[in-house]
């Protein structure tokens, strides 16, 4: 069956870039091995090699996500985690939630059938919640963990003082690979036991001898989906250029992605038993045309200028976009007596989201009355526009699909455009000013305080003709205050108070003007940042108020903001080296998250939240073995049972799980180049796992991948 394909992969473009990159390897290699390159002395800031200060192997040392300036983790009065490049290379994740599986308090959210990034942070969050950033700028891309990822920073708790409109769970900031003034080149390829694999080229180095550098990353992935049908396709082309001019640094980066992924909402819950259907986990309940195809683009322009030894200016522009079409045979209801599933043909065509971000900040260091201050002040502008064009909603026209004896191919593609549901629109404009002051009181006390004022205009609605269901034009001030005390040069304790907000809007129904959702959090914790090991312990309490609820008065539904939710718990994180040969990333979280007020959901746990989660991944470096170096690692990921709600007061319990992973890697020289061979086993004991609720109102449950073998080879020139 021929399917409409809105973003046919530009194979010529990708293959041309791969060929060009490979041609560039020979001279780069020859120059590196046959002659030394002498560059003029250039005052290169940390922007050129950002990982040197921020990470050390598995250890995170500093991050920019917590203050919008690179700050030692020890001084930050909130819980901040860093997922390092070394850890990502050992674990070889393919999605953002998998990359963050070693961080406490983070779980997969509703990924819209595996087509969107979605993270629960301390119990809050969903897909397209604007909590994912790339190099400090908001991203609307569906798939943010790409081959350009250098490391990932996670700030937990309310963060509206720094990032504006947000849920109170936190934000994730992906730091991308930057052009380097040192010539490097690598080619890698991998294969999976699911069938298929991928290849990547990464080139970087100087252009001339005056501080100009480039980077080019090209990647293609083609492999089979692990269930009984489906294929995953992804192509990335990412050139960037930077000038490190001493007092002035300028960087321009572009990334283009085209993708085609299964739209798979997973399995179903039998509501008569409250348990997942007793069918093989590989069996899909939709059709082969359940596919999302799309493309995304990201463009960033950054300029930093040092005005003096104490003051610097930064200006950023970011553009992020995502365009997609999807088709699905959507499960609507299940008859437990007959085993038949009623399905409806749904589709979204010409869905697009764009975000334009402008930011200007002034950073200064000064002393007043003998007290040191680090000031950050700035202006942010955001224009985020999302519209879902044609919404197709066929009548439930297939009630003959038997989940125990399925026959595929009998349900036609959706074809009925719903005028009432089409052109679903969410348009947000926001302008903000902010001021943050970090005060150093002597050698031990650090006080960080700030305030932000956001002026925003948001319009939502749908339909042909278009109907505006929400128009909010308002402003909101949000504060932040934190205190850090250095018990020792490497050990600190901290406490913080922070707030968040999000306008109350509705695309589906008119709700009038309602006050925004608000999040308020208190947090206390302690941190140890040693030479090779970082440890964090945090206790937190988050209240979320003004949550939308529906009430019925004389048979009429009204929307009110009487709902409240609460999240509180304990988080422990450890990363770095235990010894010179043993590295670890470990975490544990206890999370009590539930709805505390509301006519239907009061007292129920927040969707998708496990009360207990834990992970540990330990790596041993065996040193020299024969002509190379041998490393091996293994670990566990575990969570307690969690609840999937139907939105109407019913919560279904999903079982706990413990999953093991392992890898072995061998580095050795070959023909004068460094070659790495790596073998990973994911889900070593082939456990069946359930990862998230994939549709509110429908008991559909996303499933974790079975055991997978991944073989990878990399050559560094």
For the regions a protein language model found, what residue spans apply to each?
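Acidic, small-polar-rich N-terminal luminal/periplasmic segments of exported/outer-membrane proteins
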Residues: 40-182, 524
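Acidic/polar loop-and-plug regions of large Gram-negative outer-membrane beta-barrel proteins
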Residues: 221-225, 238-306, 319-353, 396-426, ...
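Conserved C-terminal beta-signal and adjacent last beta-strands/turns
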Residues: 31, 351, 375, 522, ...
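Outer-membrane beta-barrel translocator/receptor signature
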Residues: 148-150, 161-239, 243-249, 297, ...
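Surface-exposed extracellular loop regions of Gram-negative outer-membrane beta-barrel proteins
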Residues: 258-272, 383-387, 480-528, 534-560, ...
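Gram-negative outer-membrane beta-barrel transporters
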Residues: 541, 561-646, 714
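Membrane-embedded beta-barrel scaffold of Gram-negative outer-membrane proteins
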Residues: 304-318, 322-328, 493, 516-577, ...
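Structural signature of Gram-negative outer-membrane beta-barrels, strongest in the C-terminal barrel
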Residues: 238, 242-244, 353, 372-376, ...
